[in-house]
Amino acid sequence: FILDALRRKTVDHADHAASLPALGDLSVANLFGGGDYITGIEIFAVLGGDSIEKGALAGMSALKELTVPFVGATKNDTGEEGLFGYIFGSDSYSGSFEIKSGLSAEDYISPELCFTFYVPQGLKKVTVLDGDVFDGAFMNMRTLTEVVFADDADTTYIGEAAFMGATALEGFTVPAGVSIVGDYAFCFSGVRTVDMSAADEITVLPEYIFGENTRLATISLPENLVTIEGYAFYMASALKNIVIPDSVTTIGEYAFYACTSLESVSLPANLKTLGASAFSRCLSLEGMEIDQSNKDFVTYDGILYSSDYELAYVVPAGIVGPVRMPEAVTIIPGGFFSECKNLKGVIFHDKITAIGDSAFAYCTGLETLTIGKNVTNIMENAFIYAGNKDTVINFETGSKYAYVKKDAFYRLTAKEINLPASAVTFDGEAFRMCEAEVKFHEDTTLTTVVADMFKDYLGTSIELPASVTTIGARAFMDALNLETIEFDATKITSVGFDAFRNTKWYNSQPDGIVVLSGLAYEIKGARNTLTSVTLPADTVVLAGSLFNGCSNLTTLVLNEGLLAISGSAFANCVNLIELVIPKTVTSIGAQAFNNMSATIVFATDGSLTHLGDQAFYGYKGKTLNIPA
């Protein structure tokens, strides 16, 4: 027997007494004079119902294959005695490596709750002759590539986390008699192929059974399966296709979430319940299919809807399009196309009235998107991180889109947005962090660039329509890339404070009065050092608060051709002696002369037609002569 074992380097206990009863302190390695040459052991039975003691196989450093009558100490042991590593013991030896095996997924995450065993580094294959596989049995067995069961094995149960962390597993066939598989059974394992087809008593795939298994490529499911629970294949990123049996009625939330290689799915006729995000972030999935006899779901252009189209259950992340929207859909819901990075476009019909928040988030493949004419509401973040340097956003002729809300185009990375003529009302920060060039329609009647409208805008240039008369406070503030700003200064009657502050254009200007297209916008540098100023001859508008607080200014010469003086333009110029208002000035804003005592001289043939509210509020001069 020993000579035969030495010759074959395997120990076969099939025909020898007391395969592995209690051996006292004598391990198998000691029995055969050391375990550094035995590569295979087959244990077919333990006589008299005795157990395999803890550490019975300690020291078997050359072991590559092992056949056991059951997993653990006895056929029915659970707890530590039901773990595969138990028979190798908790003492290290040459050629062993440490594993941490627990009884649940929580133990896997918290190794301090696990049991420590030392198993041979080269152990690759284990054959189980009989019995169930209890919770955590093969947890963290990182060298095993194969675990097989005898054809006549009475195996009905594979426990929770049974193969969790067994990262080298190649293939696994579930024994025909198995009816229950526990949660997390193959979570974090490396099993590539799984065959469950013979286990026709399995009706439930539990939570996380294959969760975060990044090597699982193919699987055959049992034909009587009814439920695929939530997170069952969560982030199984190598899974390419799966055939879901006709018997399945329920697929839980996040069941196939982030199965990034999944290319095709055909849903069965009996499916009644589909959980939230069941197929979200399946980046290779271009379209969904469902049996046409299914009464609860329907597909339209590759998207899975409820049969009445009131809910969209799956928008495949790999969808290309352009995608047509069903007539029954009147709103593109929040997050609808989120992370559809291959989406080229969407075809709107006339019944669509709104685009929800994050509806096109991260749709980086958009080419040309023409928004339907009846869309009146675009929610915040609708296009966050959408588009690319070639993307164009258009609005259909006759568009009714009038009100642009805050962050409607936040983080849009498109080439350009061509706004419709109807878009005349804007919130502040409507284009915050937007990289697209914003183009106004030639027929727009927009009059006001509201406060903060382009604050933090990331575009490089902008041309305001000729209809604009007012630029609000901080309108372009912190638009760090903005180097070209075009508008008709002759039409501007009011510019708010810090309107262009910290733009690329502004930051390139020298100290002194900053003039843009005839707009004297701001004094850059120290204001209180100015004593005498003569405006450039082409100045047509003074921005709000332009000279506010220039306390040492004594002489100010305004140019002929100046048209408008914005609010608080001369406020607090306490030492200014005289101010001559050119006859070309037609408009003076609110509190323009607050807290100043200079003599103000108006031309008798002047063109003044507008005085703002409280234009002379706080004026301390003695005489005013305002032309009729």
Which residues fall in each region the model found?
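A structural signal for leucine-rich repeat
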Residues: 55-59, 79-82
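Consensus positions within tandem repeat domains that build extended binding/scaffold surfaces
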Residues: 55-56, 86, 135-137, 159-162, ...
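Short, flexible/disordered intra-domain loops and linkers
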Residues: 74-87
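Structural signature of tandem-repeat unit edges
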Residues: 6-25, 29-51, 61-77, 96-132, ...
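Short, well-ordered amphipathic alpha-helices
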Residues: 84-96
